UniProtKB/Swiss-Prot annotation:
This is Phospholipase C. Gene3D superfamilies: Endonuclease/exonuclease/phosphatase (3.60.10.10). InterPro entries: Endo/exonu/phosph_ase_sf, Endo/exonuclease/phosphatase, Sph/SMPD2-like, Sphingomyelinase/PLipase_C. It catalyses: a 1,2-diacyl-sn-glycero-3-phosphocholine + H2O = phosphocholine + a 1,2-diacyl-sn-glycerol + H(+). It comes from Staphylococcus aureus. PANTHER family: SPHINGOMYELINASE C 1, SPHINGOMYELINASE FAMILY MEMBER.
Amino acid sequence: MVKKTKSNSLKKVATLALANLLLVGALTDNSAKAESKKDDTDLKLVSHNVYMLSTVLYPNWGQYKRADLIGQSSYIKNNDVVIFNEAFDNGASDKLLSNVKKEYPYQTPVLGRSQSGWDKTEGSYSSTVAEDGGVAIVSKYPIKEKIQHVFKSGCGFDNDSNKGFVYTKIEKNGKNVHVIGTHTQSEDSRCGAGHDRKIRAEQMKEISDFVKKKNIPKDETVYIGGDLNVNKGTPEFKDMLKNLNVNDVLYAGHNSTWDPQSNSIAKYNYPNGKPEHLDYIFTDKDHKQPKQLVNEVVTEKPKPWDVYAFPYYYVYNDFSDHYPIKAYSK
């Protein structure tokens, strides 16, 4: 039997004290990690060109039905912010925004539809053009500022619309993060050879100039996303990164966002078309960077659905002619 001594008692007290210190340290470290996570302003975003053209002109694309299908989809859930493009049809886009309102209660109006609901309207807004800009942003977190900016110029169909970009300042965990959603000049035979590319470059510089003039603090992140109508891997892609002043990202999922080979709606329009990667979410170079940003193309499909437009029934199994992309930090 070992006799208890003063020395042994002191050692026991010292051991207990050390254990308590280690426990306090571990709790403090875990608390700091939790606080760091709490203050994190990295966002989980989605951008989707939902192909909601006017139902009067294009009655065979099931815009209202797809508004419901998108609202029920898996990809639309559990994000922080969603950017919609081509939400042109008033009724169908209103239904879509209503369908996602429970999860994303903070929403902008659709770009260029009116001047109501915005903190500011900039650029070449017109109340007489045939079409609005089709872009809307919805958020899980409060939107503290909403600005719509209509591009100075466009060509072809885009020249008779209010296409531009939507700026939002979003508050997450008491800190600001900024999201810009856009849909730049589309390829259009009425534009003339190469003119659409020239206009896209000008529009991207408008976005970059807006960010610079906004004087956003450098320690806040600025996301820029949407259907940019630039195919990844082309010479124009490098120009896009420069004109937007953004960093490239990691890519995952399907290798294109518009793919007539695998997408039933795109295939109907362009049965011999080649796949293109046109949709992106980037971050402005001059502001806080998230952890490595990933753009993942999601090819989720609904069950086959049909729509009747005299004298035919049409059957598809996609949400849109574009696939959505998810952006998240790795």
